From Swiss-Prot:
Complex formation: Forms a complex composed of PxpA, PxpB and PxpC.
Function: Catalyzes the cleavage of 5-oxoproline to form L-glutamate coupled to the hydrolysis of ATP to ADP and inorganic phosphate.
Keyword hit for Nucleotide-binding: yes
Designated name of the protein: 5-oxoprolinase subunit A
InterPro entries: Glyco_hydro/deAcase_b/a-brl, LamB/YcsF/PxpA-like
EC number: 3.5.2.9
Keywords: ATP-binding, Hydrolase, Nucleotide-binding
Record keyword ATP-binding present: yes
HAMAP family: PxpA
UniProt source species: Azorhizobium caulinodans (strain ATCC 43989 / DSM 5975 / JCM 20966 / LMG 6465 / NBRC 14845 / NCIMB 13405 / ORS 571)
CDD domains registered for this protein in UniProt: LamB_YcsF_like
Length: 253
């Protein structure tokens, strides 16, 4: 039976404030991207998320972003490529430490928000991310879009790439995510999200907002944990995939 991973961005909160429904989503997904403390997350939330993921057999990865609490890591910040390398390395190290503390281990890295968008479009930033991952632990997989700058940068660094598509985001004709400020960027309807995912997985392509098919491998599907219907969407996407004969399994167990 063919399989694909289902992931979500989790541990996104601070103190008593929690944005994501971590436990509900980890009962559905096969991989959890854990915020590393700069755009969201703190030691307590991270440790709890790692421990629960371990108990559910969910793979975990580091989800580093810009240090922008106010903007949730979704605004560009003026860091140089060298500074981005160290920023990513710092957060991956924090995730490794707290995963180990919790009896789990991270197996991959996926950059968050604005940093992820920039890394997909600017080769020097993609190289910085790859360099950081390789320096910290070259066994870690990089989870990223298959049609942007991260794919070649990851491979050139000798790292393994896992190709990710999004259930709840629209795509441009270039295979990038439509900016959140533009129409068609977000897909909130669980049925529409699942319909798109089934079509993309079965056709082996990213399908743009205009209907263009951009052929690619697909290793993982992301449902954003902060969406208003995140749990409902993740559950429905999983049910539809399994009904289509596609198993859900982590790409980096």
């Amino acid at each position: 039976m063919p399989s694909v991973d289902l992931n979500s961005d989790l541990a996104e909160g601070f103190g008593i404030w929690h944005l994501t429904e971590d436990e509900a989503l980890m009962d559905i997904v096969s991989s959890a991207n854990i915020a590393c403390g700069l755009h969201a997350g703190d030691p307590e939330i991270m440790a709890k998320a790692f421990a629960y993921a371990k108990s559910r057999g969910v793979a975990v990865g580091a989800h580093p972003g810009f240090p922008d609490l106010w903007g949730f890591g979704r605004r560009r910040m003026p860091f140089t490529p060298g500074e981005i390398e160290r920023l990513v390395a710092y957060q991956v190290g924090a995730a490794q430490a707290l995963a180990t503390y919790s009896g789990h281990r991270i197996t991959y890295v996926k950059v968050h928000g604005a940093l992820g968008n920039i890394a997909e479009q600017e080769p020097e930033v993609a190289v910085a991310v790859a360099n950081a991952v390789k320096a910290v632990d070259p066994s870690l997989v990089v989870l990223a879009g298959p049609l942007g700058a991260q794919a070649p940068a990851t491979r050139d660094a000798g790292l393994r790439l896992a190709a990710e598509i999004f259930a709840d985001r629209g795509y441009t004709e270039q295979g990038h995510l439509i900016p959140r400020s533009q129409p068609g960027a977000m897909i909130h309807d669980p049925v529409a999200a699942a319909d798109r995912i089934i079509a993309m997985v079965q056709s082996g392509a990213v399908i743009t907002a205009q209907g263009t098919h951009l052929p690619t491998s697909i290793d993982s599907i992301c449902v954003h944990g902060d969406g208003p219907k995140a749990v409902e969407t993740a559950r429905y996407v999983r049910e539809r995939l399994e009904a289509a004969g596609i198993a859900i399994a982590p790409f980096a167990p």
